[in-house]
C-alpha cells in the first residue's frame, strides 16, 4: 500500500489529490496534512544538488496543489521556526501561500512556563519545591529553542532525584544543580555519553559522526544534515559495527540525542539525525567540533 501511495504521489503535482481519491476516505471527509519542522526542507534543498533539488520543489508543489484545489477537502499545515520564514521565497508560490495563512505562535509567558514545568512533575506523581520552580523559571531564558533544553534538564533532574532520594521528598535545587542546571545539563549529559566510548579511537569516530550530520550556515546558524548510516561509515572511516554502537549509545531511552528512536532497527539506508537543533547550540563539545 505504501509503495502504491508513493507511486501516486510521484506521478504528478496533483499526487496528493489523486491519493485522496484512491483512499477509503468518505467523499466529504476532511484530510489534514501536517508537516512539522518544515525548515528541514530548506536544508535539504541547499545541501543536495541535482535531483534532490527537484524533489524539494516537487514536494512543495504537491502541498500547494493539494491546498489550492477544491475537489477534495485537503488542508495543509506546516510548522517552522520563524527565522526560516524568509527561505520560503526559494520556492515559487510558497511565500504567497504562507502569507495568506501565517500564524506566529507567541512565546510562553511566565504563567504558561510554570504550567509547562509543573504539569509533567504532577503527572509523574511528584512535587518540586517552590525554590526549584522559581529557579527554573528564571533560568529558562528567551531563546526560541529553550523549551527542549528545559525538558532535558527536568528529565535529568527527575532521573537523579529518583535514584538518590526517597520518592516522598520533592525535587529540589540540589537535585537540579547536581545535573548541571539549565545551562550545562544537556552538555554535561552528552559528554557523559561520549566518555563511555570504548576507546580514544571511538571518541574520534563519534566526533566524525556528529561533524557529518551537523554544519554551520553562512549566518553561523546550526544546520542539521541527516545522513544515511552507510554514508556515515564511509565519511568516518569507521566500520559498520562501531558506527552503530556510537549511534545506539546516543539514542538509548533517556538519552535521545540522535534519531531514529531506539526501537527502530538500523540498516545502511537508515537516516541518522540529531533530535533537535538546540544540541548544536548547547553541547560545548559539538560547538567546538563544528
Where are these regions (language model features)?
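Amphipathic helix/helix-loop-helix segment enriched in hydrophobic residues with interspersed Lys/Arg
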Residues: 1-290
Amino acid at each position: 500500500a505504501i509503495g502504491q501511495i508513493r507511486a501516486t504521489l510521484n506521478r504528478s503535482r496533483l499526487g496528493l489529490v489523486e491519493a485522496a481519491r484512491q483512499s477509503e476516505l468518505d467523499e466529504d471527509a476532511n484530510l489534514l496534512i501536517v508537516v512539522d519542522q518544515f525548515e528541514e526542507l530548506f536544508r535539504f534543498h541547499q545541501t543536495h544538488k541535482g535531483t534532490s533539488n527537484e524533489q524539494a520543489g516537487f514536494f512543495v508543489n504537491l502541498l500547494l496543489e493539494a491546498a489550492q484545489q477544491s475537489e477534495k477537502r485537503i488542508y495543509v499545515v506546516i510548522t517552522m521556526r520563524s527565522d526560516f520564514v524568509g527561505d520560503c521565497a526559494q520556492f515559487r508560490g510558497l511565500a504567497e501561500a504562507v502569507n495568506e495563512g501565517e500564524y506566529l505562535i507567541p512565546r510562553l509567558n511566565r504563567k504558561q512556563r510554570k504550567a509547562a514545568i509543573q504539569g509533567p512533575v504532577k503527572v509523574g506523581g511528584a512535587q518540586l519545591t517552590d525554590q526549584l520552580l522559581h529557579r527554573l523559571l528564571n533560568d529558562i531564558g528567551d531563546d526560541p529553542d529553550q523549551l527542549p533544553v528545559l525538558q532535558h534538564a527536568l528529565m535529568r533532574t527527575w532521573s537523579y532525584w529518583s535514584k538518590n532520594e526517597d520518592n516522598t521528598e520533592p525535587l529540589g535545587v540540589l537535585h537540579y544543580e547536581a545535573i548541571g542546571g539549565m545551562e550545562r545539563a544537556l552538555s554535561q549529559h552528552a559528554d557523559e555519553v561520549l566518555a563511555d566510548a570504548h576507546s580514544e579511537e571511538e571518541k574520534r569516530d563519534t566526533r566524525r559522526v556528529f561533524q557529518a550530520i551537523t554544519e554551520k550556515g553562512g549566518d553561523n546558524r546550526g544546520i542539521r544534515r541527516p545522513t544515511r548510516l552507510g554514508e556515515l561509515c564511509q565519511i568516518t572511516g569507521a566500520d559498520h559495527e562501531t558506527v552503530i554502537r556510537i549511534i545506539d549509545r546516543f539514542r538509548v531511552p533517556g538519552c535521545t540525542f540522535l534519531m531514529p528512536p531506539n526501537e527502530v532497527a538500523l540498516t545502511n539506508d537508515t537516516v541518522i539525525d540529531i533530535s533537535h537543533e538546540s544540541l548544536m547550540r548547547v553541547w560545548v563539545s559539538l560547538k567546538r567540533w563544528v
